[in-house]
């Protein structure tokens, strides 16, 4: 089946490394390799855009400050004006459990700085940057605030957070819901065996602490997977599991065939012979990396073998229990059949 061969002949990344930054819970570089040439750019750009636009997070959508009617006011004894206070509030990093909207309260008395850690958030909201300074009070000044917190994604301007029945003094705020602050990626060449034109994707992610970089990338990949599902308009071909018993064997009977029967090209056949691979059962337990380390064995030979194995419901990198059987030669003769 041509469709089957197209997607199964491509190499897939076999490892995902996480290189922590100076704040591991917020900053890390996710490294995926090996990828087919061009896939580093394709996946890196797609995941980056999803990370910045589509992850759900929590943000303050409105604030009410005692004695303040609108955001262009100033508060006696508070060094910052309301506009500056609102800008500081927008920097709050929150993790909310459950649905919104929810409320947070703040009561403070001067002198000194008022920080996010003084907010009474309740058990279902976590403040990830408690050291954030919201404003500075003079001696004896009292300040009270009430925050409205909601869940969302992306960026929502203050105009959309304004409710028609809002009480006087409730100031809507631009909501930056995304827990991801910065994303960058780069693609470097990597090698597998003797082949050097594969891609290595390095995705550097910085979050606000509400989600780890690794989890944010996992969520973005899941979103991408879900969006692409609609485009798959065929059923995946049924593959015979190698661990299903056939003819009282604990593995796929095709494993007992010799690789000479695969009708491979002379180059591929010689590479298998030089590597002492006699049966298909020996071959499928080799990984792609192991095969590519075989002298004179390149990507063309790898793809050829993967296509042939896929047509039998097999693949490289399989784990076969009970292999090799003690009477392998007798079994091979008894089950010998033409393809």
Swiss-Prot record:
An example molecular function term from Gene Ontology annotations: DNA binding
Region named Alpha C-terminal domain (alpha-CTD): 251-339
InterPro entries xrefs: DNA-dir_RNA_pol_insert, DNA-dir_RNA_pol_RpoA/D/Rpb3, DNA-dir_RpoA, RBP11-like, RNAP_asu_C, RNApol_insert_sf
Catalytic activity: RNA(n) + a ribonucleoside 5'-triphosphate = RNA(n+1) + diphosphate
Residues spanning the membrane: none
Region Alpha N-terminal domain (alpha-NTD), residue ranges: 1-235
Enzyme class of the recorded protein, top EC level: transferase
Superkingdom of the source species: Bacteria
Oligomeric and partner information: Homodimer. The RNAP catalytic core consists of 2 alpha, 1 beta, 1 beta' and 1 omega subunit. When a sigma factor is associated with the core the holoenzyme is formed, which can initiate transcription.
Domain notes: The N-terminal domain is essential for RNAP assembly and basal transcription, whereas the C-terminal domain is involved in interaction with transcriptional regulators and with upstream promoter elements.
HAMAP family per the UniProt record, alphabetical: RNApol_bact_RpoA (MF_00059)
Protein name: DNA-directed RNA polymerase subunit alpha
Organism: Granulibacter bethesdensis (strain ATCC BAA-1260 / CGDNIH1)
């Amino acid at each position: 089946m041509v469709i089957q061969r197209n997607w199964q002949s491509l190499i897939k990344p076999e490892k995902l490394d996480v290189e922590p930054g100076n704040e591991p819970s917020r900053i890390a570089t996710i490294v995926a390799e090996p990828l087919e040439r061009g896939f580093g750019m394709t996946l890196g750009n797609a995941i980056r855009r999803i990370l910045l636009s589509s992850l759900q997070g929590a943000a303050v959508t409105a604030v009410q400050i005692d004695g303040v009617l609108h955001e262009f006011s100033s508060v006696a004894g508070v060094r910052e004006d309301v506009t500056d206070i609102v800008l500081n509030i927008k920097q709050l990093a929150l993790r909310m459990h459950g649905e919104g909207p929810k409320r947070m309260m703040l009561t403070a008395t001067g002198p000194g700085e008022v920080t996010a850690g003084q907010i009474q958030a309740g058990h279902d909201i976590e403040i990830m940057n408690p050291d954030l300074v919201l404003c500075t009070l003079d001696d004896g000044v009292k300040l009270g605030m009430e925050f409205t917190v909601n869940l969302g994604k992306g960026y929502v301007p203050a105009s959309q957070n304004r409710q028609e029945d809002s009480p006087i003094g409730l100031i809507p705020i631009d909501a930056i819901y995304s827990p991801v602050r910065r994303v960058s990626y780069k693609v470097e060449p990597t090698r597998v065996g003797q082949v050097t034109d594969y891609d290595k994707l390095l995705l550097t992610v910085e979050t606000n602490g509400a989600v780890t970089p690794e989890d944010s990338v996992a969520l973005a990949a899941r979103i991408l997977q879900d969006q692409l599902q609609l485009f798959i308009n065929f059923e995946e071909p049924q593959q015979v599991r190698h661990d299903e018993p056939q003819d009282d064997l604990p593995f796929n009977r095709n494993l007992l065939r010799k690789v000479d029967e695969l009708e491979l090209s002379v180059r591929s056949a010689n590479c298998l012979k030089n590597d002492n691979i006699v049966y298909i059962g020996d071959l499928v337990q080799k990984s792609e990396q192991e095969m590519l380390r075989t002298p004179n064995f390149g990507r063309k030979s790898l793809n050829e073998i993967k296509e042939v194995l896929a047509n039998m419901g097999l693949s490289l990198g399989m784990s076969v229990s009970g292999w090799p059987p003690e009477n392998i030669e007798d079994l091979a003769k008894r089950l010998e059949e033409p393809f």
